[in-house]
Swiss-Prot record:
GO terms for molecular function: structural constituent of ribosome. GO terms for biological process: translation. Residues 1-25 are annotated as: Disordered. Belongs to the bacterial ribosomal protein bL28 family. Keywords: Ribonucleoprotein, Ribosomal protein. NCBIfam families: L28 (TIGR00009). One of its GO terms (cellular component) is ribonucleoprotein complex. Pfam families: Ribosomal_L28 (PF00830). Gene3D superfamilies: Ribosomal protein L28/L24. This is Large ribosomal subunit protein bL28. InterPro entries: Ribosomal_bL28, Ribosomal_bL28/bL31-like_sf, Ribosomal_bL28_bact-type, Ribosomal_bL28_sf.
Length: 100
């Protein structure tokens, strides 16, 4: 499982620990990933994603998972999010056709 946010795409960075004597040793900066189940209104069930707190805040700001996915261009989404976006769009179109 990759250490990458499914929404924002944030991943592991590398750098140095620098001591007071200016000795440098390599280290990794890991993203703060949280396993979360987000409710999708179009799909009718929750979807499990690995998301950073910043990604969760972005989803909430946009008005939920479905609104975030449909509003965000594909070039800004990760592969997992693009797959989920297609599923949400299909389910929303199916629901729209059913109500019409």
């Amino acid at each position: 499982m990759t250490r990458r946010c499914d929404i924002t795409g944030k991943s592991v960075l590398s750098g140095n620990n620098v001591s007071h004597a200016n000795n440098k040793s390599r280290r990794r900066f890991l993203p703060n990933l949280q396993d979360s189940a987000l409710q999708s209104d179009a799909l009718g069930h929750s979807v499990k994603l690995r998301v950073t707190p910043r990604g969760l805040a972005t989803i909430e700001q946009k008005g939920g998972l479905d609104a975030f996915l449909l509003d965000t261009p594909n070039r800004k989404l990760t592969d997992e999010a693009r797959t989920l976006k297609r599923r949400v769009a299909k389910a929303a179109a199916r629901r729209e056709a059913k109500s019409a």
